[in-house]
Amino acid sequence: GANSVLWLGLSDDMADLKSENKVLRESTRVQGIVSVNGAHSFNSQNWKKMINMSDKIFDFMIKRFLKYPGMDVDKWLVNYKLKKYQEAIDYFDFMDSSDPPMLVANYGDMVPKSLSSFNHHPIHAKYLKQRADSLSIENYVFAPELGIESKDINGILDFILKQLSE
């Protein structure tokens, strides 16, 4: 959920104004983004940089994380690493100064207790904040484990009400 919200909110408008389908002509732009415990990126290279991880360890981690019946993880990894695919999914690299305000809250543990904990690590919030600040995107970030707590807004509800009133 949180990653999908970031992908949609940070993507360029996908409206197809020439479509005969009324739904496809609608804008996909949002007024604000709320992401709770999401990752900073879908790009494997960005993840490896964040946690200083080798390809071998990253592949091992993904293989353990994606262990589902019928899932061909090796095939998934090959497709996932394709540059064209990475460019299409990585909302971190989509970010630009035209993006809507965002609230990012990450309350994960500093020491991951499981493989899925990496997806919810507070450092993701730090990376999103740094990127948003560098692009002058209005942002409110809460990652208490890292000492990051926006003082300009009193949480998710205040953020949502602020975005809807503007």
Where are these regions (language model features)?
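Stable alpha-helical elements in mature extracytoplasmic
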Residues: 1-5, 26, 87, 91, ...
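Surface-exposed acidic, glycine-flexible loop patches that form ligand/cofactor-binding
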Residues: 23-27, 92-97, 164-166
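C-terminal catalytic histidine-bearing segment of alpha/beta-hydrolase fold enzymes
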Residues: 102-117, 122-166
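Mobile cap/lid helix-loop segments that gate and shape the active-site cleft of serine hydrolases
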Residues: 10-14, 44-94, 100
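Structured segments of extracytoplasmic/periplasmic soluble domains
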Residues: 7-11, 36, 94, 131-135, ...
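Conserved long hydrophobic alpha-helices within structured protein cores
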Residues: 1-12, 95-107
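Short, proline-enriched alpha-helix->beta-strand connector loops that line the catalytic pocket
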Residues: 26-31, 96-102, 135-137
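Primarily recognizes the serine-hydrolase "nucleophile elbow" in alpha/beta-hydrolase
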Residues: 1-52
